[in-house]
Amino acid sequence: VNHAAPGSAFNHTAVTHTGFVKSGWAHTGLVKSGLVKSGLVKTALVKAAVTKTVVAKAAVTFLAATTAVGSNPVLNLGLFVGFVAVTLYIVHRVSSGNQTTSSYYAAGGEFTGGQNGIALSGDFLSAASFLGIAGGIAVHGYDGFVYSVGWVVAWLVGLLLVGEMLRNTGRFTMGDVVAFRMRQRPVRVAAAASTLLISYFYLLAQIAGAGGLVALLLNITGKFGQSIAIAVAGAIMILYVLIGGMKGTTWVQIIKATLLLMCMALITIFLLGRFGFNFSTILSQATQHNSLGNAILTPGTLYGKNELDFVSLALALVLGICSLPHVLMRFYTVPNARQVRRSLVWAIWSMVGFYLCTLVVGYSATALVGSDAIVHAPGGENSAAPLLAYAIGGSILLGLVSAVAFATILAVVAGLTLTASVSFAHDVYASIIKKGNAEPRSEVRVARLTAVIMGVLAILGGILVNGRNVAFLVALALALAASANLSTLLYSLFWKRFNTPGALASIYSGLGSCILLITFSPVVSGASTSIFPTVDFHVFPLSNPGIVSIPLSFLCGWVATMIGSREENPAKQVEMEVRAMTGIGSGLHS
């Protein structure tokens, strides 16, 4: 292990004497999947979304760093228990009377644009953002900041194309919009299948990561103990959803996002003060303590190896985020389209501020810790933020950052579980099984039961994939959302002729092509960071299928619409256009 930067608060001795460098943890697929030991193709999937790989690597990083500097697991446990206790109390207080579908599914549309915007940003200002982006900047400089740009730009799709019209046209789910003027049964089944599949892939990765984070922070090394940690994390998630519904889940996300933003802002201010509030001084010292030297201030240190895969990833990232079911559902928690605009503006500005702070944190980590120490520490470049936290605040700050990371994961998994349960209860049970005649209380009961089932399945799946590289799950969820959902929504909202065959074709072609291409890609086999690294049956050369599956979904939707029979319903078409543009007649919370 190389020495840290001269004069830094963290040196190589602490790392080498922890034993983690020589342990099996340092050689798992989780660590090997880092940017340092893989190319753009493998890395992009890991950093493009909140993935189990990033979270698990973050957990390894936290444990190694806290062990190295003598952090107390009891402190971490106390912070975890404290956060869970406080948030459960708040969820219970704000969620009384969650017996109607409007209240349980959409919080009665009672949140303001500002509150909803903070909750929206909380879905993405995650442990991966904090650790991954800060670490990428610390090691690679300018190129490490590119993902931040992609995440912010992605929200413009929601602001300009989807948000307002979706809120005005639907009530609770994407299925409401797509099935508005089409045959209800097949379209709602397709929409529910898409939502459940995307949510489960996302949820599986997150719940495994949450359990892994808790297990590693508390120094639980046995498989049985780690399984218990995953089960506990899943149980907490289920409690949030059962007790709180959308209102309670939203408050958890608001609290988590606020903590994360405050934590990042305070660290940034402290770092700027340490360098005389002169960012140039930070950059100058960073170049001296990074093996790349001045190159970290210019593009080209990381990207350019596989342009086509990067374009494919960019498409999935920019077009997928605002097509994710749990994001779409959040547009219904505000009273009108104006508040949707405000929500997205708040979310965008929150993320802009956060990612600007990562510039200071990332370059400061290089300046104070040194890129060599970061790269060779357990967890690779994801160790930048924990090592920096100890350098400036000791074990207490490390514990706080750990608690915030855990809060981040819980907020995300609660939102995903709620989305999946609502989609089944509203689109399948109420609209298809009960043919629109379900009692609100019975529909909410079905939603709660579905949440428990989804939670149990996620726990079991998380235990099964514990310790494996499942980065492809979230990458697949993002590509699925961009392929299956975006094309269907845009056609439904903007193309009068779009019909039931077109909707089914766009959804199922997006789902099928994504799963097929990812199965036969380097993500699953044929590479050292693959799910099955010892075999090679990949035939698709790219790690992200977005560049193929997204256009294919649009094409299939168009072809099926053109060859299918016209579904003339002028009255429904006019009603949909008026509602989409004005919100008149939406009756969302009636």
Tell where the protein language model's regions lie, with residue ranges:
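Short, strongly hydrophobic alpha-helical membrane anchors
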Residues: V1-S71
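Membrane-embedded helix-loop-helix hairpins and adjacent transmembrane boundary segments
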Residues: N2, V60-S590
